[in-house]
């Protein structure tokens, strides 16, 4: 599986950067359109990797995205949870690059390079990583029952 992921590294980086460009700021209603765009991005990704059931659930707050792949109904369920929203990037003057224009930089802490963008670490990067790991498991017919739930972290739902 590691070799497969390494072979698709550039493709995966491009996809992650695409997701990170979406300013899905949950605390500001003027970004509600971006929250919906991010939810649809996750929905599309789950469908593309082969989930059997993918749905966007509308809530009084922001949408919840759910996807599952069931291969063996008798196996335990694994639930992967994450959120696709981000906090406002203020104060902007503390950013060395625009928060929704991801860049890969080498630093003393990350000599191999790291992505700098709002949401790269909390939590779009992790959601993306789980979707891609799930994709590899589906390709190898490995998941017994796996469910992915993503939501806006601040919907209070």
Predicted regions and their residues:
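N-terminal helical capping/dimerization or prosegment-like subdomains
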Residues: 1-92
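Active-site metal-coordination/substrate-binding segment of hydrolases
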Residues: 75-155
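Alpha-helix boundary/interfacial micro-motifs
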Residues: 34, 40, 46, 67, ...
